[in-house]
Each structure stands twice: as C-alpha cells, then as structure tokens.
Amino acid sequence: MKILIATDGSDFSRKAVEKCCEILGKESGAEIKIISLVERPMPMANEPFAISGEYYLALEEDLRRQAKNAVSDAEEIIRKNTGGNKLSLESEVLMGNVKRVIVDEAAKFKADLIVVGSHGRGFFNRLMLGSVSDFVVHHAPCSVLVVKTETDGDKE
C-alpha cells in the first residue's frame, strides 16, 4: 500500500498521522510519503509599499522551517507507532498551491490513499477543511481519508 500524508504540524495533522499508523498496524511493506507544503507568501494590496522583498524571503524561509519540522514530527510518530515494521518512509517539503500540489503529488507517487487532517493551523486553518480537503477529495487519483478529532463537530 502506498500512502501519501499531507501535514502542517498541527494537532489535527498529528491525529491524521496517528490514524495512518492505526491503519497500517503491523503491516509491512507499506510505502509512506509525508509532504508538507509551503505556499509562497504574496503581498496584499493593502500592505504598505515599505515592506521589502527581504521580508517575504524571511517569511518564506520561516514557513519552510515549519514545514521541515512538520515532516520530521510525522516521521517520528510513524517510526514510534509502527513497531519497527519494514516500511519505506520518505518525506519532502514542496512549494506551490496546497490543494493542487497534494493531488499532483499523489498521482506522481501513485498513492493508494491520501491522509489529511480535518483542520490545520495558520494558513492551513482557513483552507484545510473547506477548499483544500474538498478539492483533494474530488480531484485525487485515489481514496482520501480526512481525519477528524473528537473536538470536530458535535460530540453527541
């Protein structure tokens, strides 16, 4: 089984990684690719012109650092929770439009399953449950698992 996990390092993403470990159980031979995405920050029309290009470069570098930490955390969770299974694990930080890159990477990786959290943090928080997960579910070349936490929705 080939599984693509998209993470931003949020608690919701960690839950998705843990759910992936539950699905894998003691299965060996799985191929897992963890991706975290950086969308290039763009100036807003109402920002002062005094904001320099260096500001955006620094912001992009910070986003890359956060993305690297997110994939490292996900790798650690998988290694810890799969009991040393024989599985292939790779990770990558990618640039581009979040929803498009997830779908494109799933096709390139020939994923059997995409795993994402139901929400994210920061930029992802505004997008993940709505447009990103909706786009991925409707355009992915494989099945998609959107993992909710117990704080999502009603607990009734």
Model regions: which residues?
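Structural beta-alpha unit
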Residues: 76-114, 151-156
